[in-house]
Regions:
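Charged, amphipathic alpha-helical scaffolding segments
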Residues: 23-63, 110-149, 196-224
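Amphipathic, heptad-repeat alpha-helical segments
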Residues: 1-33, 61-117, 147-203
Length: 224
């Protein structure tokens, strides 16, 4: 089994380097062993170098660290704040209900990932398990986010309503006018005020559909 599997690039490269050095030292030691003319000094020196290589590869093996970068990225994505500004209120309620349903799984995955990330020397298996849990709950979080719907654009209705309000505010002088024309003006003014109230209700309704907004805009323009 390759001990560098799932380890950080730096610690894995360090281990591989020390392993190559140890393998080179084994070959040199074998040459000394096979050399019947080797002196005691040569044997002692090679023994020391072999021991140094053993210590170096053991240290490199102990220094191997599980690569947590994937887990860290997944964790950071999981804890991102979900912006519900500009979303339809009904869809926000549905989103919150969906999040509530996975709250325990979410908290467990988040907590475990945080513990592993804080741990200076977790096993590769621990990192992999934590990542698996984070990715599993992230799919459910994504499903919940997809429930959110943007509010429809009502800016054209707001503009039309403001124009109608301006028309209502600009009251003409009725002095010297016939009663019929005054009555007609008052009736139209009441209709306009009613249209303004209806328009405001649609504007204030975050769940209003594009058709409701469009229909209300037409009514306001008729009242203009």
């Amino acid at each position: 089994v390759d001990p560098t599997q799932g380890m950080t690039t730096d610690t894995a490269n360090n281990y591989k380097s020390k392993k190559r050095e140890a393998e080179d030292e084994i070959q040199k030691a074998q040459q000394i062993i096979n050399n019947g003319d080797a002196t005691e000094q040569q044997i002692t020196n090679e023994t020391n170098r072999v021991n140094q290589a053993i210590n170096a590869i053991n240290k490199a093996k102990n220094d191997l660290r599980a690569d947590k970068s994937q887990l860290e990225n997944a964790y950071n994505q999981l804890i991102q704040n979900v912006d519900t500004n500009g979303k339809k209120p009904a869809s926000i309620q549905q989103y919150q209900a969906a999040r509530q349903a996975i709250e325990t799984q979410y908290n467990n995955a988040k907590s475990e990932a945080h513990q592993i990330l804080e741990n200076s020397n977790p096993s590769v298996n621990e990192v992999a398990q934590a990542l698996q849990k984070v990715e599993a709950v992230q799919l459910k979080v994504n499903d919940a986010i997809h429930i959110l719907q943007n509010k429809e654009n009502n800016s054209a209705l707001v503009t039309a309503k403001n124009q109608l309000q301006q028309s209502v505010n600009d009251q003409p002088l009725t002095t010297g006018m016939t009663q019929d024309s005054i009555n007609n003006y008052e009736a139209k003014r009441n209709e306009a005020q009613s249209a303004i109230r209806n328009a405001e209700a649609v504007i204030n309704n975050g769940d209003a559909t594009a058709k409701q907004i469009s229909d209300e805009k037409s009514k306001v323009e008729q009242a203009l």
